[in-house]
């Protein structure tokens, strides 16, 4: 179901799981100029927002939503760079209150995307430096993994495109060069302009996915709270 031009909602019906999942996926052309900004933006999204301005506040709120799990992921697929924001939460049939949790999760999705913690036209500097250090430490740990190291070396032999050959040292330097302002600018750019591929994926359990019921669900669950603008063709 299309929310606006270029942004669609995809419903996947399944009875296999005890949880529901909502995933927002941004797809951008792979670029050396934005790869570090995308990675740091993804890290910042799951750290805090204006309603929950510290990591502790956000984790406490997630715990109050019956242990909802929130995660981000940033990865390459072909010549595209993909940023994902995922929420996994318990199905209604296991709760005493019905038809409440999904709306609360969607409000949190909205806050996460449209109300990050911003200081002087950039991400909060203190939070940003913490996330940058953690990202660099994670990359360094990956390079100590022999399988990951071998995979990166194989990339250098297999690909001719420098975007796909990206070495650890180059990526590390690009991350070090990022500032709260440059990463926030990158975040605003992909939020406004990048295409949405499978942008909102809702894994539905015990829900009949007909056109009428999907339309009703979109209205009830407040998907219209997202202020998305149309993408160009």
Where are the predicted features?
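His/Glu-rich zincin catalytic helix
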Residues: 1-65, 171, 184-233
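M16 family metallopeptidases and their MPP-like homologs
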Residues: 12, 18-31, 36, 58-111, ...
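Short amphipathic C-terminal alpha-helix that caps PH/PH-like domains
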Residues: 41, 105-113, 210
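Short, polar/flexible loop-turn hinges at active-site or ligand-entry regions and domain interfaces
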Residues: 48-51, 93-96, 115-124
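Sec/Tat-exported extracytoplasmic proteins
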Residues: 45-49, 113-117, 139, 143
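Short, charged beta->alpha transition segments
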Residues: 70-73, 116, 182-185
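Acidic/histidine-enriched alpha-helical segments
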Residues: 59, 115-139
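Scaffold signal of the M16-like zinc-metallopeptidase fold and its non-catalytic homologs
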Residues: 136-193
């Amino acid at each position: 179901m299309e929310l606006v031009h270029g942004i669609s909602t995809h419903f996947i019906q399944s009875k296999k799981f005890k949880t529901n999942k909502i995933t927002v996926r941004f797809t951008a052309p792979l670029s050396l100029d934005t790869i570090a900004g995308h990675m740091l933006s993804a890290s910042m999204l799951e750290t805090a927002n204006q309603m929950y301005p510290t990591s502790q506040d956000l984790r406490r709120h997630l715990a109050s939503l019956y242990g909802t799990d929130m995660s981000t992921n940033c990865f390459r697929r072909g010549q595209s760079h993909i940023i994902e924001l995922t929420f996994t939460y318990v199905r209604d049939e296991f709760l005493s209150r019905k038809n409440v949790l999904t709306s609360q999760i969607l409000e949190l999705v909205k806050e996460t995307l449209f109300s990050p913690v911003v200081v002087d036209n950039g991400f909060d500097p203190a939070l940003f430096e913490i996330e940058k250090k953690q990202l660099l430490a994670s990359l360094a740990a990956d390079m100590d993994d022999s399988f990951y190291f071998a995979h990166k070396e194989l990339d250098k032999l297999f690909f001719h495109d420098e975007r796909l050959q990206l070495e650890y040292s180059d990526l590390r330097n690009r991350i070090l060069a990022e500032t709260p302002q440059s990463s926030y600018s990158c975040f605003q750019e992909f939020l406004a302009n990048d295409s949405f591929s499978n942008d909102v994926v809702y894994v539905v359990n015990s829900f009949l996915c007909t056109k009428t019921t999907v339309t009703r669900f979109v209205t009830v669950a407040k998907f219209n709270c997202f202020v998305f603008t149309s993408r160009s063709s």
